[in-house]
Amino acid sequence: MCVNRVRSIVSLTLIAYLSVLMGVSVYFYVLIESVYQQFSDMSENYVQLVKDTSSTPIVVATHGHSTNRSHQSVLFTARADVNISMETILHVEFNYTTALGTMDDTFNIINFYGLKYRHVDLIDPFGNSLPVVNSKSSFGFTDCSSDERVRCPSTRRPFTGTLDCLTLDMHMQSWNRDRSTDHFKRPIIIWLGEIMGSLWRLIGNGVIVIRVNYRRGVYGFVCHRDERLPYYNQGVNDVMHAIEWVTENAERFAGDTKRITLAGHGDDGKVVEYVRMYHSHHLPLDKYIVMSAAETGSRDLTCSSNSNILVTAARILGMPSVPVHDTTAGERGVYDAVRYLSFIEPKRLMERLYDLKEIFQPCPGEIRSTASDVNGLGKAFEGVDSDDCKFINTDTPVLYMNTLNEYANKVKLDDSFMHARAHTLRRVIEHVLARRFKPHRVTRYCNVTISEPAEIGSERYEPCDGEVINVESLGRVLTDFEYIAPTSRICEAAVGCGASFYHYVYDFKNASHGDDLRLLMSEHDQRNLTKFERQLADGIGMMISRFVRRGYPVVKRDNWCSSTSLVAQIMEINTTPNVITTQTQVRGTVER
């Protein structure tokens, strides 16, 4: 019995010893395997880093097997030594800026969101912006045009947004080729403002789209004459910094620094036109696109001063009329108002300014071009003098785009037009026309334009020499003089000097201000669009893409005029429901 017990003890001891030995062996094996894997990764990263630093940075490098997912994770980084395991990695040096994006396999598009190009000083939000150093995106997949965490404070309800909003989004087609040659570099379009939707029609045509946020409203366009306050047109300065960022980094993402276009719609289009008029002489931009911008090319594009409205807003929000500690001092002015408003919540400030119905636009500066004088609103175009041409940049093509009913939505939304008597409508029209043409032209224009008799409810309106007019016709009258006529006049002046200015007016049913941009940004499978609207959207995308790539929106042909006058050179889309046609008029002769 003792012998058996000894044998059992020995067996158990041996088994325990072997178990411990096997456990230790497995532990050391796992440890060695881990160390080996770590050194292998370090070696691989070092080799990749050496390759990246000794050669041109790769635009897109795809690692691993392909997948069928519609979206893949992408890293947009400035540091090639960051070890991140992802399907698609982009190594680019962009002032040490890091951001996350998505890969859209449907159109083979890479989207990069939330790239910081400057910082707003939160202590002094009306002041100069600050440079970006070692910035990393903290918002993940963030669309700067729609996410209130990164977009600029809105001037419309619900007044959301943040002060530190100087970001940009970049969209491009993915490629993995040798981009060392100029032939492969892609043209760039810098689109100003917070646009909702996708610009895949431009990206699919080989254009790199960069959407830029900049300060607008009161934070972007404080106009004053107080020498103590060094704030002036910060919104324009933000745009300048964004352009500088793009030109400095364009080659890193295969962008062509010789083909950079600045574009905008509506109020953003006004900023584009302002930049063209005041700063085109020193910017590396080779084209401009202005969509649906009212009063283009005129002095009305700028405001002289909004100091009084700032002081009023500051007092409403609690600023004392005189300094608390110095009652002998005079009343506070714009300097004190701006200092006080710097510490007011943006939403509260925007609400007060909205109630005061104040619109902030770029402030006038030193005129570098006499284009606004040559064709300014209120002056009849009599031809361009040779001395005026030397101030007009004839080397930079400009594309202007309008719809035939830009003003229609404003008329429809204003109840005063719906219930006004004839004399009220006539006064409104005369007020609009008198700002632009000599009085004797008012009656003449009404006789030519208003030809559609109609009734609004039970009322008949006769604002122009006994002719009746409906709301739609009134919208077209105001559109011609708020949007189309000023643009036509600046085109006439520029083309008279040999410039390449293009103007297109779209006429499609029930369209008004903003519908051209809405169609351009519509999705390919959007169900609420008709077949013709899809054709129209594709046509707009094709023209803009061709203009960005080549400098002209359509193929040039004989007797094709590159501009328009009040009644000539109009491109009409919707001449027939299912066909897109181009109608041009040169010296009174219509060609189809």
Swiss-Prot record:
User: What's the superkingdom here?
Assistant: Viruses
Q: Where is the active site?
A: 513
Q: Name one GO molecular function term.
A: carboxylesterase activity
What are the EC numbers? 3.1.1.1
Provide the membrane topology annotation.
Single-pass membrane protein
Q: Name residues in a coiled coil.
A: none
Please name the Pfam families in this protein's record: COesterase
- Tell me the keywords, alphabetical order: Glycoprotein, Hydrolase, Membrane, Transmembrane, Transmembrane helix
Q: Which residues are glycosylated?
A: 68, 83, 95, 447, 510, 528
Reactions catalysed according to its record: a carboxylic ester + H2O = an alcohol + a carboxylate + H(+)
An example of a Gene Ontology cellular component annotation for this protein is: membrane
What does the UniProt entry say about where the protein is found? Membrane
Segments crossing the lipid bilayer: 12-32
Which protein family is named in the record? Belongs to the type-B carboxylesterase/lipase family.
This protein's name: Putative esterase
